[in-house]
Amino acid sequence: MSKPIVAVVGRPNVGKSTLFNKLCGQRLAIVEDTPGITRDRIFANCEWSGHEFLLVDTGGIEPKATEGILAHMREQAQIAIDTADCIIMVVDVRNGLTAADEDVAHMLRRSHKPIILAVNKCDNVGETPMELYEFYNLGFDEVMPISSVHGHGTGDLLDAVCAHLDFSETVVEEDRIPVAIIGRPNVGKSSLTNRILGENRMIVANEAGTTRDAIDTPVDNAYGKFIFTDTAGLRKRSNITDGLERYMVVRALAAVERSRVALILVDATVGFTEQDSKVAGYAHDQGKACIIVVNKWDAVEGKETNTMELQRRGYAECFSFMGYAPIIFISAQTGYNVNKLLQLIRDVDSQNGARVPTGVLNEMLARATARMQPPSDKGRRLKIFYLTQASTRPPTFVAFVNAKHLFHFSYQRYIINQIRENFGLEHTPIRLVVRERGSGEVGAKEDRKST
């Protein structure tokens, strides 16, 4: 299912980021921050009262010197309107109601989405400042005094947010492979979906997906049953601004959440961009099976016999953090390699859901440690007592060892590579959890590596 999206909106210096950090750091159990995409902490997968949602802080958008504050606020509001299921508008009780507040509130009202007004910096517990009441002039039904610094009122705020969200699960047939098609604007996401539909006539139906404006398209063909989620509803505006890129990322995150396989589309005529890495990084950290799909190969001019291999090496370097992801060159326009892509989707999905019996796993471990002796330090050598698989999607293995600090990064990578080679898991992320054991007891120390 797709997690609901909650956006935090407000003019600079009203405490948006402080509120975001307070919710994520203390009031909410963070499921996982989004590495790569969120170096400035704009996204967090969060949980409150047993419900999960994606929290988005639009505060990272800063106006350029030539932009006015109202233009900045309009951009923030538009992002919230386009992506969120519920909006928290933050204002500053100390500064009172401003023209910028009124301007963005007017835009938000037109969205017809649930809006909660969080009046920040009400720091005295049990006291309602008189200045609070002027914010009722904005016309919102829910006006809540909070203190993002001290956490006052944030629990009530989250209760109000969750009351507006739909947490019902979208049921997907278990035998269908949910596939997210993600990428920058104009890389050919919609064209790829249309090509798949055009070549494979056994279409079940088109359904409006729960992902924001995305379309779920179930497809049956000789390669299996799929449900493709195309985020092609996002179209490039006059300029790719920082705000628009954030908008694109939020849309992509929602599609990735409900997928098992993520197709990261890249435009062969443009090449790699930082935004490609950001979107791919989120899919990687969610443990999805990923495929780097280089589209528009037919439009690349001056190709020679080694052009594809040279470009493959270049993309492999750009996406080095997910070296397991296969790279395939296609043309959605001509159909080149599209059927091969469908088979590849099945292969990576199968690997992502694979299970390895504990006995077979430890036979492999014995061979691996005999081939390359575990590292030692100051006369003490690492001993891996045994390996077991804890879960799938992605395959997650637990290693019980005598001393966690002896299990060096390089040797962890060696063991993971042995798992890949021995069990045909070359094209899925693998997580290795290290638990320290002493005197027959499982220690409290734990470490995790994902690759």
Predicted features, each with a name:
Residues 92, 117-123:
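Accessory, often N-terminal, substrate/partner-engagement and coupling regions
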Residues 87-88, 115, 290:
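Hydrophobic beta-strand scaffold residues
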Residues 56, 60-81, 86-101, 105-109, ...:
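Hydrophobic alpha-helical bundles that form the membrane domains of multi-pass transporters
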